[in-house]
Amino acid sequence: MKENDVVLRTVTKIVVFILLTFGFYVFFAGHNNPGGGFIGGLIFSSAFILMFLAFDVHEVLESLPIDFKKLMIVGAIISALTAIVPVFFGKSFLYQSEAYIHFPLLGELHVTTITLFELGILLTVVGVIVTIMLALSGGKS
């Protein structure tokens, strides 16, 4: 982009914060409401792509300690393990376990394995979408 895109860069900083916050909300709300890992991953991806459009791609990649190719592999492994591990304990494929854990400041928190599965989906979607966009753009904004 040009050096004088002050408005775009300023608005991007605000919009990226909003997108990442909304992505977290959609991810965690997806357990009981519409949303989850896939939609949250798309929202996270759009935040990264917006940063690539507003700023220099190489500067953004240097400032983010994220390798998106490794991110998609880690996400796929997390999802696969979450789906397969219950089989070794005599449960069905993709069996969901849940527990209530007490935290001193938060109180009682409802934790499920589906959240871990959705995290794997989110990481995979972010890794795939951003890798495809970087490949299509040639790593240039």
From Swiss-Prot:
Transmembrane segments: 10-30, 35-55, 70-90, 116-136
MF-aspect GO terms: antiporter activity
Gene Ontology CC entries for this record: plasma membrane
GO biological process, one term: monoatomic ion transport
Recorded topology in the membrane: Multi-pass membrane protein
Pfam family, one: MnhB
Primary location group: membrane
Keyword entries, A-Z: Antiport, Cell membrane, Ion transport, Membrane, Transmembrane, Transmembrane helix, Transport
Localization per Swiss-Prot or TrEMBL: Cell membrane
Parts forming coiled coils: none
Family: Belongs to the CPA3 antiporters (TC 2.A.63) subunit B family.
Subunit structure: May form a heterooligomeric complex that consists of seven subunits: mnhA2, mnhB2, mnhC2, mnhD2, mnhE2, mnhF2 and mnhG2.
Protein name: Putative antiporter subunit mnhB2
